[in-house]
């Protein structure tokens, strides 16, 4: 295979600029930049925020290769009856995740089925990040006067930089693997909920079948 070598590029049109190429190759992920006078060089993309890494999937045991290792999701095969004690929501786990270098926010998202098995049932939930309950992730639901079926989406942005806060979920830095998950409970045995369930399904009526939650992350930042 032939090789052509040059240190300058120029267009033949009148008034065209002459560009001087870098003398060495750049690193993976770098872009070519100009200094405004025709000298080109490799450097990082310091522009606007962009998605650096993302996955979202049913909790069926799938594995995803990330910039810092493989993340394997849980495999949910049954529903969860809530109690008055907070329980981990099966399938909501993302374990050992480290975002790419340059990440300033990680968005954690879980979508799951719920069915109230009592009238006006009451539910509570929160996100747990690296073993800490995040105060501002708390949420509550109350069912209708009859049974309720719903597909609930929980979404929370974890900001990186500044001071760590278990109130807002902010992390000063994120350079090692952390676990993210949801926990749920119910008010009492007269206000019961079931999670990871498909209740009624249109014309097919009541199903009571297991519905795997969908879980994922989006890492946002600059290269």
Give the label of every model feature segment.
Residues 10-12, 38, 60-63, 114, ...:
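Short loop/turn segments at secondary-structure transitions that flank enzyme active sites
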């Amino acid at each position: 295979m032939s090789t052509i070598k040059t240190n300058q590029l120029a267009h033949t049109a009148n008034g065209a600029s002459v560009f001087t190429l870098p003398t060495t190759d750049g690193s993976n992920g770098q872009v070519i930049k100009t200094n405004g006078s025709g000298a080109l060089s490799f450097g990082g993309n310091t522009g606007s925020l962009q998605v650096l890494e993302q996955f979202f999937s049913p909790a069926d045991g799938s594995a995803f290769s990330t910039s810092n290792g493989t993340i394997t999701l849980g495999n949910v095969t049954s529903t969860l009856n809530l109690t008055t004690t907070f329980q981990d929501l099966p399938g909501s786990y993302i374990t050992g995740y480290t975002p790419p270098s340059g990440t300033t926010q990680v968005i954690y998202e879980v979508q799951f089925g719920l069915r109230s098995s009592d009238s006006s049932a009451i539910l509570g939930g929160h996100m747990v990040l690296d073993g800490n309950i995040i105060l501002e992730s708390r949420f509550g639901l109350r069912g209708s006067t009859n049974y309720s079926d719903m597909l609930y989406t929980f979404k929370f942005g974890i900001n990186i930089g500044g001071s760590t806060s278990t109130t807002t979920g902010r992390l000063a830095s994120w350079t090692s693997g952390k676990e993210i998950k949801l926990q749920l409970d119910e008010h009492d045995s007269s206000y019961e909920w079931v999670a990871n369930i498909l209740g009624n399904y249109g014309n097919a009526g009541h199903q009571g079948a297991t519905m795997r939650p969908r879980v994922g992350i989006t890492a946002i930042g600059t290269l």
